[in-house]
Amino acid sequence: LHDVTDAVVDSITAMHQENAPELVYYMALYRIFSEFLDDISEDVLPNEGLGFRDSLIWNKLYDFQKDAVLAIINKLETYNGCILADSVGLGKTFTALAVIKYYESRNKDVLVLCPKKLKDNWITYNSNVVNNPIAGDRLQYDVLYHTDLSRTRGTSEMGLPLDRLNWGAYGLVVIDESHNFRNGGDSASDDKMNRYQLLMEKVIKEGVKTKVLMLSATPVNNRFRDLRNQLALAYWGDPTGWSEKLKLENDIETVFRNAQSVYTRWAKLPADQRTTDALADMLDFDFFKVLDQVTVARSRKHIQRYYDMSAIGPFPRRLPPVPKSPKLSTVSDSINYHEIYEELDSLTLAVYMPSSYLHPSKAAKYAKLGGGGNLSLGGRETGVRRLMSTNLLKRLESSVCSFRLTLERLLKAMNDALVQIDNYRTGCATHTSVTDGDLPDGFDFDPDDENAFEVGGATKINLEDMDWISWERDIQADADVIRTLITMVCDIDPTRDAKLLELCKLIREKVEHPINPNNRKVLVFTAFSDTADYLYENVSAFAKCELGLECAKVTGNGCACTLKAVPPHMQDVLACFSPVSKERDIVAPQLAKFGIDIVIATDCISEGQNLQDCDYLVNYDIHWNPVRIVQRFGRVDRIGSKNACIQ
């Protein structure tokens, strides 16, 4: 037996003892944050002795960005990776530059991987140019495109020899727009790696221990696995040790699998029950633990609530969106969307499905050839057919011009196939095979769709192995439908295009009643370059003649501008459109007297561009992926905007 009387008395006395509020406060702080005290002895906090707080980039950051830098460094040191997922327009590039400066101060080589269209966002800050506000920091990081990962010969646009580059020497890799790697390595074939796998094998796993900082305002596209694939770059595809370090009850693969299952159930709930709070209650604690420990994600509301806005300046107020639903044509008895859809629904698109017409005795021969990657020959064909069907509907929603051009290209593909079959029938063919399973050119497919066909390739099918008579019959039936549709939409010219006329009306109203004083700028987004060409041709003439406005077009195929003095280059055009945010007078003083009022663009500028001089954005078509819409809004809804409100 052991006498515990004294211990009990002491405990009761301590419970009833009067303690100073300060002591209670400190004890509470200790209980909440004690685990972080271990960090001090584990070398995962920023090393203040490096003097990174004296750098130019650090002193250009707002307080919320400085907090992000410190958190990112801690997460990189602790978990080897971090996703900076602040909302669009909150300055992720500058935050990342401060992290880069810290690691360069530690003599780490740094690689920045970015989309080609965003190269100027990065090469400005490591170059000796007049518009580099942090030139004194002498940043030395390398810049490569995402696509350079797949190249084995030649030099990068920045002059790096890709065949001799020491990929494994980088201590830090910064991936801008990391959601482009969200599909992971699942689509790779046995003999060819995709970009994700090349990044993992050549850069991250090889050589020195590499830390990975990922930047994306939209790391999740439509499934939680998108986030998991990006985080896998940080744990090198080996989740076991990472799960232990995060102190998860389940391994990280299970965490994301469960989260996706929960989300799927939540998405099927009635609308009144499908709330954010309901989803949060359904997800398990491990999922939130992962998010908390390896991501930094703040919204505009978070910044407004927890930081001094007098230093940052107010964000522009978002006016309620204005939806417009114009008809296809101003002519009352013209064809409508429903009638076109019924015609499209009758198409078999047999021209893209030749393997469906193989003789049964020949099917095994082509099954062995396969389609590459995880796609069989038939699966590849089915994918192309579905993409073409979707593409027709998306282009119809975009503009009657884009739809008509697509029909004409489709008809040409059908006519070419019919000629090939006829030559085979008459014995005039120089070759007797048709190409199967490849994406056709000239259809402006979304990059997400093209990525699915990144590996593998087309297969040649001999006509003698096919029931080419049935194939010819079905192609001919489709061609008849396409000809009918072309005839029906050809009457809808720009003077009868209700959607185009509605856009011109919006521009006129904006100019006559600006939402901010003297601001006449309008940014128009479309998913297709054909639509952008069509809009530029018609809107620029209207804007110039009737409103005295200058107009420009920016697509992946090139630029154009009504101001002949402005070079048809993206950066020059955007500098004249948004001269304050793009520092036009410093970057291009020869263009200081030229201003552009309207820019019509594809999604080639929906990421990473600072265009906040503009206060009015029009989605001429709605991209199927809502993430793209968020990115479009982020071009004008940004920190540092001088506009009181945006539309």
For each predicted feature, which ranges?
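Conserved Helicase C-terminal RecA-like lobe
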Residues: S41-L61, G313-V331, N336, D345-G595
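Conserved segment of the helicase C-terminal RecA-like domain
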Residues: R635-Q647
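Conserved Walker A/P-loop ATP-binding site and its immediately adjacent core
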Residues: T95-A98, R106-V129, P219-D226, T526-D533
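A short beta-strand element within the Helicase C-terminal
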Residues: D226-N229, N610-D621, I646
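Conserved two-lobed SF2 helicase motor
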Residues: L139-S156, G168-G171, C576-E607
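Inter-lobe coupling linker of SF2 helicases/translocases
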Residues: V143-V173, E177-N180, G185-T210, M214-P219, ...
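Conserved helix-turn-beta segment of the N-terminal RecA-like "Helicase ATP-binding" lobe
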Residues: K117-Y141, A234-D238, N538-E546
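ATP-dependent helicase/translocase motor core
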Residues: L1-S87, F94-R106, T124, G168, ...
